[in-house]
Amino acid sequence: MRIILLGAPGAGKGTQAQFIMDKYGIPQISTGDMLRAAIKAGTELGKQAKSVIDAGQLVSDEIILGLVKERIAQEDCAKGFLLDGFPRTIPQADGLKENGVSIDYVLEFDVADEVIVERMSGRRAHLPSGRTYHVVYNPPKEEGKDDETGEPLVIREDDKPETVLARLGIYHEQTAPLIAYYNKEAEAGNTKYLKFDGTKLVAEVSAEIEKALA
């Protein structure tokens, strides 16, 4: 089962990725993790990536695709894998196809921007411990204070509405073409495209995924 996940930051993708990994026993492949592992292991591709990163440049699609191919050839991917954060562009999606990497399912988690802004901007964090709260969904016992220490909670830079909106803008710009691409692929019978309502309860979405992948 080879799966690609699409969804804006804050759409609940990470939670469902964990559910799929546990349920089907397949690993999640993140390009960031792969890059770090290849650099640490000093593989040929790792060395190439390191020299590019050290020069302050972006790692090419060619190197990333090489890493993906190496990674999915490993034993733990025998039953399949979950790609998150890749492909991000049409050339990357084409690259996967040209390298003979077939995808069984593309799962999109759809949540309106205003809902994501509300979700993210309601987050509060206690930085020293890493504990997180939400003013609506998981409020602290006392407003604005950490449950255990009573220290003040903060809004992380990443959760501020303007930051969230900027990230969403980039996401839509990058991902809208991919959504169209994989819908076309599904029409051609090359993959199955499934769209889920990310505003539903986590357990509901998980149940829908399980049913769709059965």
Swiss-Prot record:
Q: Sorted alphabetically, which keywords does the UniProt record give?
A: ATP-binding, Cytoplasm, Kinase, Nucleotide biosynthesis, Nucleotide-binding, Transferase
Q: Which Gene Ontology BP terms does the record give?
A: AMP salvage
| Region span, LID | 122-159
Principal cellular location given in the protein's record: cytoplasm
The record's GO CC annotations read:
cytoplasm
Please write the reaction equations for the catalytic activity of this protein. AMP + ATP = 2 ADP
Q: What class of enzyme is it?
A: transferase
- E.C. designation(s): 2.7.4.3
Kindly list the positions annotated as binding AMP: T31, R36, Q57, L58, V59, G85, F86, P87, R88, Q92, R156, R167
Task: Offer an example of a GO molecular function term for this protein.
Answer: adenylate kinase activity
Q: Where is this region: NMP?
A: 30-59
Which SUPFAM superfamilies does the record associate with it? P-loop containing nucleoside triphosphate hydrolases
What are the cysteine partners in each disulfide bond? Answer: none
Identify the pathway.
Purine metabolism; AMP biosynthesis via salvage pathway; AMP from ADP: step 1/1
Q: How does it assemble?
A: Monomer.
Q: What does this protein do?
A: Catalyzes the reversible transfer of the terminal phosphate group between ATP and AMP. Plays an important role in cellular energy homeostasis and in adenine nucleotide metabolism.
Q: What is known of its domains?
A: Consists of three domains, a large central CORE domain and two small peripheral domains, NMPbind and LID, which undergo movements during catalysis. The LID domain closes over the site of phosphoryl transfer upon ATP binding. Assembling and dissambling the active center during each catalytic cycle provides an effective means to prevent ATP hydrolysis.
**Similarity field:** Belongs to the adenylate kinase family.
Name of the featured protein: Adenylate kinase
Q: Which organism is it from?
A: Aliivibrio fischeri (strain ATCC 700601 / ES114) (Vibrio fischeri)
Q: Which gene encodes it?
A: adk
